[in-house]
Swiss-Prot record:
Required for both pre-rRNA processing and heterochromatic gene silencing. InterPro entries: Las1 (IPR007174). The keyword Zinc does not apply. The keyword Nucleus applies. The gene is las1. It comes from the Eukaryota. One of its GO terms (molecular function) is endonuclease activity. It comes from Schizosaccharomyces pombe (strain 972 / ATCC 24843). This is Pre-rRNA-processing protein las1.
Length: 470
């Protein structure tokens, strides 16, 4: 059996590339971003070795079709000519030259392409509409005679690259856990030691720097197998997470005995936990530009996932609850770490320079938290609502309402029976007064136009041309 070396490692890579150029069943045209992505992947693969002619031709034809510059006509002519020559020249093996039309019939290539190639080479270039139509017909021919047969052929590749990655991740995770265990054991004994002194002053500083460098180096190492969908995005966070050990290192930090206590602990223990791990986080963040953004993003995903497991109809005040479950305790500490990192980044602390948090980001987080009723997002609101005065004023009625809901309790049937009609009226009057206050405040500071509420700025009248100090 003939074996050929190809630039993709797995059939899934080939299928992903095919999906960039062709929709399933060739129905419609893929979006422009997918076409560009396919061209980029082939360009990256070309650095690995020879690209099959049909794959390279597809890339050239697509590039010519999506080009908008003045040279599109010439680009289409060249790509069509190469498409025909690349198919027919390799089978021209006779001692005497065989007409191209005959060779074309042997591979079921319409003679239309041969005639068009002859016109491009020896006559005046055909018009742009003719070339565009020819390029599209060439792509259809390539789908029928190369891409679809290759995609549906039985794969003889028995090597499981996914399993290789999983074994690699297991080994890396064990290594990272050992390094974090070393740090935890030493830091608990030397909890007050300054870890940012010059390296030459203390031996423990040298050991600390060596441990940090080992973690950073490990995080930067590539996975054994990188999917085709992650080619040529070197400066992208998603690329770093999907193709290196960064995701493994970050996940190790979010386990028990690291950023989460080994057993259920009250939230008041957080300052002590922070004192243990903050120097290590700060040092890694200064040496790995993606570490802090990856940790921040993963924390948020974990918090949202845990919050979905809490019954939205039950409001828990964790400060008064006698015993927390493991999941509740973990969720609280993840929320505390997330709020701490966001506060540090929002206030511009130097060690968080790789993590950008704008007012829009802060507002988005607060809005999402306000839509949830779990105790973890309440922690985030309590920590972050005071960071920005403008946002605090904007959301204050919602903050107050949510706080009141958390202070309330779900009553059983017996407790409902004990409530008198007068008590219910008093409670209703209280809410009415609050609603009137909110409406009065809205009337004085907002106006409605075409269904939208606009906040009116409080600006004193002044003569035209006079500078108003804000």
């Amino acid at each position: 059996m003939d074996m050929k070396v190809v630039p993709w490692r797995l059939k899934e890579d080939f299928l992903y590339l095919m999906s960039c150029f062709y929709n399933e069943g060739q129905e419609g045209i893929p979006d422009l971003a997918a076409l560009f992505r396919g061209v980029e992947i082939i360009q990256a693969w070309s650095t690995r070795g020879r690209i099959p002619h049909s794959v390279e031709s597809t890339s050239q034809l697509v590039s010519s079709l999506i080009s908008n510059d003045r040279s599109q006509k010439l680009a289409l002519a060249v790509s069509i000519s190469r498409f025909v020559s690349g198919l027919l020249d390799p089978i021209q093996q006779s001692q005497y030259a065989i007409p191209m039309a005959v060779l074309a019939k042997s591979i079921d290539l319409p003679t239309y392409f041969v005639e068009l190639r002859h016109a491009i080479t020896h006559e005046e270039l055909p018009s742009l509409p003719v070339l565009r139509q020819a390029a599209q017909r060439a792509l259809s021919w390539l789908y029928d005679h190369y891409w679809n047969p290759a995609a549906t052929a039985e794969s003889e590749d028995t090597y499981d690259y996914t399993e290789t990655n999983e074994l690699h991740k297991f080994e890396i995770k064990r290594k990272v856990k050992d390094l974090l265990k070393q740090w935890r054991s030493w830091r608990k004994v030397n909890v007050s030691a300054n870890m940012f002194l010059p390296v030459e002053e203390h031996d423990y500083i040298q050991q600390f720097e060596a441990l940090v460098q080992e973690l950073v180096t490990t995080a930067n190492l590539r996975l054994p197998y990188i999917p085709a969908s992650f080619v040529d995005d070197e400066k992208d966070l998603d690329f770093a997470i999907e193709t290196t050990n960064l995701d493994i290192v970050v996940s190790c930090f979010l386990e028990k005995r690291v950023l989460i206590p080994s057993r259920t602990m009250p939230i008041s223990f957080f300052p002590k936990l922070k004192n243990v791990w903050l120097p290590l986080l700060q040092s890694i963040a200064s040496k790995h530009s993606f570490f802090l953004p990856a940790l921040f993003t993963t924390l948020w995903s974990e918090i949202l996932e845990i919050s979905q497991t809490v019954d939205s109809l039950v409001f828990l005040d964790l400060k008064e609850k006698e015993e927390l479950t493991d999941k509740e305790s973990a969720g609280c500490y993840l929320a505390k770490w997330y709020a701490y990192l966001m506060r540090e980044a929002y206030t511009g602390q130097p060690w968080t320079s790789t993590l950008s948090v704008t007012q829009t980001d802060l507002a988005s987080v607060l809005e999402i938290c306000l839509q949830r009723s779990d105790p973890f997002t309440k922690i985030i609101i309590d920590e972050l609502s005071i960071l920005d005065k403008e946002l605090e004023n904007k959301f204050s009625p919602l903050f107050q309402y949510r706080s009141d809901m958390f202070d309330s309790r779900i009553l059983d049937e017996q407790e409902f029976e004990d409530i008198t009609l007068e008590q219910m009226k008093t409670e209703l009057n209280k809410f009415s007064v609050r609603l009137n206050n909110i409406e009065a405040q809205a009337d004085s500071s907002t106006m409605e136009f075409q269904g939208h509420v606009w906040y009116k700025p409080s600006v004193e009248p002044s003569p035209i041309g006079q500078i108003i100090e804000s």
